[in-house]
């Protein structure tokens, strides 16, 4: 998996209750090197302060509130990785998400512009999973 550098762009607005877990799930990835970019749409809570306090390596960018698409595009422009991934600030990844995607792209020598993984949804119980999903943490 040589030559893969992934920048993860996390757009956010007023997500202090979720964003730390989202970034923790990125930081815990088995695949490295990573660049984590938080693009804050001018939150009115202390989202950016909490991220800066708990995750010193996260690059924090602030822009006036323009919506999630503008935040993603801003993050892409500021990214240094040769691959870009997105995670919404109220979501989390399995610890091997990027590893499995990079393996698949490398193994099949893909020049993919898009890679998608199955989702697992929880709310007091398991609502959906794929047979291929590894649910161990």
Model-derived segments and spans:
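Conserved donor NDP-sugar-binding/catalytic core segment of glycosyltransferases
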Residues: 98-127
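Short aromatic/hydrophobic "clamp" motif used to bind/position activated sugar donors
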Residues: 84
């Amino acid at each position: 998996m040589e030559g893969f550098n992934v920048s993860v762009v996390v757009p956010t607005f007023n997500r202090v209750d979720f964003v730390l877990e989202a970034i923790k799930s990125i930081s815990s990835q088995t695949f490295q090197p990573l660049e984590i970019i938080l693009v804050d749409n001018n939150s009115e809570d202390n989202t950016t302060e909490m991220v800066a306090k708990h995750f010193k390596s996260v690059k924090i960018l602030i822009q006036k509130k323009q919506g999630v698409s503008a935040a993603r595009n801003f993050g892409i422009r500021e990214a240094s990785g040769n691959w870009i991934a997105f995670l919404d600030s109220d979501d989390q990844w399995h610890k091997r998400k990027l590893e499995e995607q990079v393996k698949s792209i490398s193994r099949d020598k893909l020049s993919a512009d898009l890679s998608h993984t199955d989702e697992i949804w929880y709310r007091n119980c398991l609502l959906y999973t794929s047979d291929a999903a590894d649910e161990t943490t």
